[in-house]
Amino acid sequence: MEYYVVHQLNGEVTGRNRPFAALTVEPEDTLDLLVAGDSESYNSVSTMRLWDDKGITTYDCGQGAQRIPETYYMLKHAFKKQSPKIVILETNTLFRDIGAVKSTQEILTQAGQYYLPVFRYHNLWKTVVDEPEMHTNYKGFVIRDEVAPYEGKPDYMKKKKKCETMPEYVKVYLEKIEELCEKNNAQLLLVSMPSPKNWNHKRHAEIQKYADGKGITYLDLNKKVEELGLNWAEDTQDKGDHLNVYGAEKVTSYLGNYIEENYELEDHRNDPTYEAWNQLAEQYKQNLASIKGKIEVAKETGVGK
């Protein structure tokens, strides 16, 4: 019943519910990599670039302002049909503290929606579209062509002595995510996407300390801005909060090489079973080419879209 309803609605579902619906109708055991987290995740990893460069099948299953209970149940939902080798967890979501009472309510809500999925989908017949129609979804990634330069301090990752502590309920759910990945033979990779507005050394230090203590791989791309070739005058859509598609392409190119060097994933590009990915990637390239002119104009004039 759940599969039928979601399959019928998937093309109409947008916003926070879309990843749940879309993951439900993805062919079984076809995804190599899942990317979870808040909006930093799905604005930073271009699924079609990873496919075109490395033949890696990726789904961005993040949600705007996704909280850690949502992350956990999103991944638990995904593991019902998928066997990804890697789960990337974007770390900005690990600092969302909603308070003890609200966090308890959040946990109960997410648990209920996971075990009784009709609660999640019961309003989808009258879904309100909250994404602009012009944005096409590519396995969770959406091309963002806005340009709004970051004009803050370039040394936003300057070392600080103190750490910023993760909320306790976040640590509980992070451990549950670790256990979930281990149970499903997926390697957990913590990644901090470049974001001067959201990230700093205090947060980096906290995640690094946690990762070292747990033996989890942690990659902070805020420490690699020059290596990535990021230009904060051109590669952000909203003054350093999120990357635009130019920034996402640079980050994804780096991630693809990093994954190739550190993990063993099969290249599916010549596998006829995955021909739909080649077709979607071609559509992505055509769409990307059509908007590059607009971005170039924005870069030259210094005015965002």
Task: Please name every model-derived segment.
Residues P27-V45, H242-V245:
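Catalytic nucleophile-elbow at a beta strand-turn-alpha helix junction centered on a G-D-S/GDSL motif
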Residues A36, E40-P117:
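Membrane-embedded segments
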Residues V35, D60-G64, K161-P167, V191-K197, ...:
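Second-shell loop/turn segments in exported
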Residues Y4-V25:
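Alpha-helical transmembrane signal-anchor/signal-peptide segments
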Residues A100-Q187, H268-K305:
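Secreted/periplasmic serine-hydrolase-like ester/acetyl group-modifying domain
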Residues T236-T273:
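Histidine-centered active-site loop/cap adjacent to the catalytic His
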Residues I86-R96, D145-L228:
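Conserved, well-ordered alpha-helix/loop/beta-strand core segments that scaffold catalytic motifs
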